[in-house]
Regions:
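N-terminal low-complexity, Pro/Thr/Ser-rich intrinsically disordered segments
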Residues: 1-22
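Catalytic zinc-binding patch centered on the HExxH motif and its immediate surroundings
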Residues: 11-15, 24-51, 63
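Short pre-active-site segment immediately N-terminal to the catalytic Zn-binding motif
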Residues: 50-70, 80-84
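Short active-site segment of divalent metal-dependent hydrolases/proteases
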Residues: 74, 78
Length: 85
């Protein structure tokens, strides 16, 4: 079974208009941080004021951290959590 991070649609795959706060954590800590927000995943994101907070796993199943960053930043840019267009 291939392991990958879903690429966001082009219209959400761009720089965030505010401040981006990026936390790269060991996989276990990233999962715990996301679980505290009700997200059961390796990575997550949320908006806080004019900031986009990204929780990115280090040592996770996908080694390309930029793939996680693109995916999670897209959620701050309006991509729905169910990944619909």
């Amino acid at each position: 079974m291939p392991i990958y991070v879903l690429e966001p649609p082009a219209r959400y795959n761009h720089a965030y208009a505010g401040t981006v706060i990026e936390r790269v954590l060991p996989l276990r800590e990233a999962r715990q941080a996301c679980a505290k927000r009700g997200v059961h995943a390796d990575a997550c994101s949320w908006e806080s004021g004019h900031s986009c907070v990204l929780i990115i796993p280090r040592g996770g199943p996908v080694k390309n951290l930029q793939a996680y960053i693109r995916h999670e930043r897209a959620h701050c840019n309006g991509w729905s959590e169910n990944h619909s267009e």
